Structures are given as structure tokens and as C-alpha cells.
């Protein structure tokens, strides 16, 4: 009788639901999500499958199957659960705009553009320096300019004694030369007015006077250079420019040089550097309309701060050696602590003048490239200028193109241009 009573009580409890055996379970995996809305009712680790690919959101790296992983979308401020919400990537460089330092892909950082009133969201509102936007970020002393020694002394322009080049300024410019060594004299010992400034080579005390056997009109030459600098900007689809450097071996009063630069329109574009300060970026020089740097081979004059003493603001290697193996990388003249320097790369003939034959050897692409890298390594400083005679022989401009693509002397050498 007692057994029957116990059985009866159990049956009553079962049907009343008190023992829970017949109670329906609406959350089988006990993950807090009802089975009716749980995409994985028997997996306590998963409950959602936004893209319906059979992989739960917790395990799925791309919940909405839009091609962008969830972590990336979260960083890029797009919705990882909405297939129509994807990271913005204006320049399609696979870096979303939120994380991209160069949103429009023009090679210039966003902050750099904003600080210079350029639009970081418009790749047509940009700046190109020496053909590439990235060079705008280089400081003046962290770029290598091809340089012509005695640039005015060209057979094409009627110079027949002491020739240094076959072709004149126009061809040099078209060939990529952007730094020029020139010598300023008065046309004669008697004609010494500001209007009498010429480009000639030799000692002013020599007989005959150095301008007596060849002279180049300095006013016409600099006016052409000014025009070439202006016209290079006119051919660009966007803002662009190039920085030009003059190194003057001077034999006239400073006020006569001032007259020369004023008359040729060059004064307005000259940059004045304060000794001891960092050199500015090439881009800033161009944007500020100060795309001409002038050095002269004599002591500075406070009345003419734009005439930088090249021996104070920089230095130069030796020059005019007799043999290639005599060429050195070390300081010959000037202040070796300065970052701006000239790597001179020309030989003198047995007559003491430029050698048109052996210029082929020392201007050869691989010879000059290897020498430039060797000197860069030895001095732990990129050459600012590589200067040659007979620039037409060899590949001076191709060498500097290659060098400027290198961040460091130990960088991989890019292919021949």
C-alpha cells in the first residue's frame, strides 16, 4: 500500500511539471538565445550567422561577407554586420581612408597638404617636384642634383678655347641638368660697369683678359634660365616645379651681381638660408616661389645674404685630377660639417683643360653611379651635387635619377632608367 502511494505521488508531480521532465526547453544550448532565433541552437559558442555562410559570427572573420574582415571594418569605422557598409578607400591602395596617411594617393601626406592649403581629398590638387610628388618631401640637402661645370662654356655657344661642354643651356636644361657652375667677370679691364658682367673663364689678371677669347652674355644666359624655370611649370597639369642651384666663381662686385639678377628677373625667386638651420623641403621652396639657391666662392656679405658662401654653407671634393684613380671623396675646400656638398667628377687633360675623350670614361653610367654610392657611404652623406664636364658624354642625369630613388647608400640599386 505504501509503494502504491509513493508511485501515485510521483505521477502527480510529473504531470504537474514539478519534476521538469516533460517541460519543453526553448534554449537547448543554454547560450541565452532562444532556439527559434539561434542560428546554432546546439552550439553554445554561436548564435548568429549574418551572411548565412554556415559559420557563426564569433568564428567568422567577415560576418557580412563584404570582403573586409570584421576587425578591419571596426578600425575603419564601417559596420561589420552590414554588407552595404564598407571601408572608404579613395585611392584604392587597400588602406581605408580612416587609416590612410595619404587619402588621395598623390604621394603627399594628408597633414603636409593641409598645412600647405592643398586638398588631401583631391589628387588633382597636388604638387610635383622634379617630376615626382615624393621628392617634395625631401629636404634640399637630401636630394642629388646633376651639375654642369662651367655650364656656359659650350662649343654650341661659340666658345672655342677652354670648352667644357658641346651644348649650351637649352640642351642642358632639356637633358635634366639643374645645377650650374658659372664664372662672372667684367668684359674687359676697362669696361667694368654693372652692364659689363659676362661669363668667362680664367684669371681676371691674365693676359689676354679671359673674356677676350670667349664671352657669354650673362644677362641673356640668366634670362633664358629664368624663362626655362617658368616654362617648366606651365607644362604641368598640376602644381609643379624644380629647384635650381648656381655656384658662382665671382670676379665682380656684389652689387654688380645684384644688378645682374635684378635685370634678369631672378632675384625674386632666390632663397636665403640662415646658417645652422635645417634646409627646407624642396616642396616648400617651390610653393614659396624660392626655387633658386645661389652660392659664390667667396666670403659672405651681410648686405647680400642671398649670396651664400659655399665654403661656409657647404664643401667640395677635389677636381680636375689626371687619372680616375686619383679622384677622392673627401673634403677639399669648405666646411665638411655641412650637409650640402659637391662631388666633382671631371678630369683635366695634359693641357690643364677639360678632357672630352676621357669624360666618356668618368661619366659612364656605372662608373659614375658606383663612385657616387662609394662617396655617399664614405662620407655618410648623400652628395647634393654631382658635377661633370661634357655632360653629353655618359649619363649624369640617369645616375642622379637612380641615386634619388635610393633612400640610403645601402639601399637596393634600382634598374637603369
Label for each model-derived stretch:
Residues 1-27:
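Secretory targeting signatures
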Residues 9-12, 34, 53, 69, ...:
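Processing junctions and N-termini across compartments
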Residues 18-131:
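Extracellular calcium-associated, cysteine-rich motifs in secreted modular proteins
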Residues 128-417:
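Catalytic cores of phosphodiester-bond hydrolases, prominently lipid phosphodiesterases
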Residues 2-3, 39, 164-168:
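Short, 15-30-residue, compositionally biased linear elements
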Residues 6, 21, 95, 172-174:
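Short hydrophobic "helix-edge" motifs at membrane interfaces and signal-peptide entry regions
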Amino acid at each position: 500500500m505504501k509503494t502504491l502511494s509513493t508511485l501515485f505521488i510521483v505521477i502527480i508531480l510529473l504531470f504537474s511539471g514539478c519534476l521538469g521532465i516533460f517541460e519543453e526547453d526553448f534554449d537547448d544550448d543554454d547560450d541565452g538565445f532562444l532556439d527559434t532565433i539561434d542560428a546554432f541552437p546546439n552550439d553554445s559558442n554561436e548564435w548568429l550567422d549574418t551572411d548565412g555562410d554556415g559559420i557563426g559570427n564569433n568564428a567568422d572573420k567577415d560576418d557580412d561577407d563584404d570582403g573586409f574582415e570584421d576587425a578591419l571594418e571596426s578600425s575603419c569605422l564601417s559596420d561589420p554586420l552590414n554588407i552595404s557598409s564598407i571601408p572608404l578607400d579613395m585611392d584604392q591602395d587597400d588602406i581605408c581612408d580612416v587609416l590612410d596617411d595619404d587619402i588621395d594617393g598623390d604621394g603627399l601626406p594628408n597633414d603636409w597638404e593641409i598645412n600647405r592649403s592643398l586638398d588631401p581629398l583631391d589628387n588633382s590638387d597636388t604638387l610635383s617636384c622634379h617630376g615626382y610628388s615624393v621628392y617634395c618631401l625631401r629636404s634640399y640637402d637630401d636630394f642629388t642634383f646633376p651639375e654642369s661645370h662651367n655650364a656656359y662654356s659650350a662649343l654650341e655657344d661659340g666658345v672655342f678655347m677652354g670648352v667644357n661642354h658641346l651644348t649650351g643651356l637649352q640642351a642642358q636644361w632639356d637633358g635634366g641638368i639643374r645645377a650650374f657652375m658659372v664664372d662672372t667677370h667684367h668684359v674687359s679691364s676697362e669696361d667694368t660697369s654693372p652692364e659689363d658682367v659676362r661669363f668667362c673663364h680664367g684669371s681676371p689678371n691674365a693676359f689676354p683678359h679671359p673674356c677676350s677669347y670667349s664671352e657669354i652674355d650673362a644677362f641673356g644666359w640668366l634670362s633664358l634660365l629664368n624663362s626655362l624655370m617658368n616654362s617648366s611649370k606651365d607644362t604641368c597639369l598640376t602644381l609643379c616645379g624644380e629647384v635650381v642651384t648656381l655656384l658662382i666663381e665671382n670676379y665682380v662686385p656684389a652689387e654688380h651681381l645684384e644688378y645682374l639678377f635684378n635685370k634678369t628677373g631672378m632675384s625674386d625667386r632666390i632663397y636665403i638660408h640662415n646658417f645652422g638651420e635645417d634646409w627646407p623641403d624642396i616642396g616648400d621652396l617651390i610653393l614659396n616661389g624660392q626655387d633658386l639657391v645661389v652660392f659664390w666662392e667667396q666670403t659672405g656679405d651681410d648686405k647680400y645674404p642671398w649670396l651664400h658662401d659655399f665654403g661656409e654653407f657647404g664643401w667640395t671634393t677635389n677636381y680636375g685630377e689626371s687619372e680616375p684613380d686619383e679622384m677622392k671623396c673627401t673634403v677639399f675646400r669648405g666646411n665638411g660639417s655641412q650637409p650640402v656638398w659637391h662631388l666633382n667628377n671631371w678630369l683635366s687633360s695634359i693641357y690643364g683643360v677639360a678632357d672630352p675623350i676621357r669624360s666618356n670614361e668618368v661619366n659612364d653610367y656605372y662608373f659614375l653611379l658606383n663612385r657616387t654610392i662609394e662617396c655617399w657611404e664614405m662620407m655618410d652623406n648623400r652628395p647634393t651635387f654631382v658635377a661633370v664636364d661634357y655632360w653629353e658624354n655618359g649619363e649624369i642625369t640617369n645616375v642622379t635619377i637612380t641615386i634619388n630613388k635610393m633612400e640610403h647608400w645601402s639601399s637596393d640599386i634600382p634598374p637603369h632608367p
